[in-house]
């Protein structure tokens, strides 16, 4: 028996004690993230949002086996948000349509949901009326039975049979009424329920998964009362697709007890918020760097290369890497680098090394004096820089794996590592270093 075949099937139940613990963690991390974002100017916030939405659109499509050009998505979002100085890659009409759906949903999060809106969004996903070379119904609820299957033709495995077409109008009316109704459980739980509820109805022939994730984002935006989105769950689901589909299948064969789904969903939310912290740290450090370096004369090539590394490109800064990325000769790369060293923009990691590597100078003074108990830890295979800042503040910053490896091998000095990952903590006035952020 499938869940929708039960009476009152949407009276979902869960273990409140287990779920509330994770809900508190999510809410705390949301608060920390938005506290950090409050230190950014509006332009920097838009850039952070654009990067997040780029990942959301790309990975939400990738979950369904659809590959989008990331640069096209980024360009489309930047243009629609009015962000300048972004490398432009002309997006396809399809990419523009998909991006338009996401932006409409989050920018109008406080507007009521409707059948017409959902149908228009689904149409945008399939402008030609085809999905994987098969003609599908678009702009309307499906008119045929829907079986979720896998395997080769003739030996398919049925994972789920959705409600029959004659039930879709009433099922969706009930869903939309709940979606626009009073929030009695908190936006995090509501977003998880909306996701599960919508994909279980499966109202369209295709596009249901992407719409479910968009609706989840909408409810999170409502809960935060903000159209600015800085984290997304799609990238985390994409990393764990097998568990995603396995849990959905178990819950859809269950009796409405959805604790397992809520726990999994909120753990992915926590991962998404941690990833967003990394993006924000990168933007904070980059902003701090350019405040200091704004008056330093540089060529366009030097500026582009610095921005590439400031945005987290994972590679050592060497003349060979510089020449390859900048598409210039090695001699030109050496001149570029030496010029920036002379201007205190780059510093040699190990002075006199046979094959020198360089780090970007965020703060000209050694900030190691402000940090104690510095170490590198691992969590789920991801390296983190942990330290105590000014004797009372615990810092935990996600690192590039290459930097963690180089530090442990003695190739990256502690001062340069702290400079790269913790500069946002320090601002400078005309006389002394001071705290850039007191509280997040």
Give residue ranges: language-model regions:
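Short, intrinsically disordered, low-complexity terminal segments
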Residues: 384, 398-401, 424, 430
């Amino acid at each position: 028996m499938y869940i929708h075949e039960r009476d009152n099937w949407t009276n979902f139940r869960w273990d409140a004690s287990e779920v509330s613990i994770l809900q508190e963690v999510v809410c705390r991390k949301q608060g920390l993230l938005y506290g950090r974002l409050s230190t950014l100017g509006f332009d920097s916030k838009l850039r952070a949002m654009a990067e997040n939405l780029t990942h959301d659109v790309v990975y939400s499509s990738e979950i369904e086996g659809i590959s989008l050009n990331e640069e096209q998505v980024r360009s489309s979002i930047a243009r629609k948000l009015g962000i300048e100085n972004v490398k432009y890659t002309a997006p396809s009409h399809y990419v523009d349509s998909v991006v338009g759906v996401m932006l409409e949903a989050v920018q109008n999060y406080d507007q009521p949901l409707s059948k017409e809106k959902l149908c228009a969004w689904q149409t945008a996903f399939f402008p030609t009326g085809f999905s994987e070379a098969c003609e599908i119904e678009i702009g309307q609820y499906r008119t045929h039975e829907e079986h979720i299957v896998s395997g080769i033709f003739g030996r398919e495995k049925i994972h789920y049979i959705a409600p029959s077409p004659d039930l879709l109008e009433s099922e969706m009316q009930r869903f939309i009424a709940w979606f626009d109704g009073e929030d009695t459980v908190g936006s995090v739980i509501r977003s998880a329920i909306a996701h599960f509820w919508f994909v279980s109805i499966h109202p369209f022939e295709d596009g249901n998964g992407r719409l479910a994730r968009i609706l989840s984002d909408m409810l999170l935006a409502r809960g935060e009362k903000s159209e600015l989105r800085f984290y997304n769950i799609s990238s985390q689901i994409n990393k764990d697709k097998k568990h995603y589909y396995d849990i959905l299948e178990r819950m859809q064969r269950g009796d409405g007890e959805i604790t397992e789904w809520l726990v999994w969903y909120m753990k992915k939310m926590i991962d998404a918020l941690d990833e967003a912290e990394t993006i924000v740290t990168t933007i904070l450090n980059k902003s701090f760097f350019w405040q200091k370096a704004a008056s330093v004369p540089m060529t366009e090539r030097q500026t582009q290369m610095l921005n590439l590394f400031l945005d987290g490109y994972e590679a050592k800064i060497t003349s060979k890497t510089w020449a390859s990325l900048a598409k210039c000769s090695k001699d030109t790369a050496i001149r570029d680098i030496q010029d920036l060293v002379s201007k205190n923009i780059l510093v040699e990691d190990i002075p006199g090394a046979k094959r020198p590597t360089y780090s970007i100078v965020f703060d000209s003074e050694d900030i190691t004096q402000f940090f104690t108990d510095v170490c590198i830890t691992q969590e789920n295979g991801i390296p983190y820089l942990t330290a105590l800042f000014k004797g009372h503040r615990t810092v935990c910053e996600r690192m590039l794996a290459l930097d963690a490896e180089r530090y442990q091998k003695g190739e990256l000095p502690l001062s340069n590592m702290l400079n790269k990952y913790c500069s946002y903590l320090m601002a400078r006035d005309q006389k002394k270093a001071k705290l850039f952020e007191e509280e997040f």
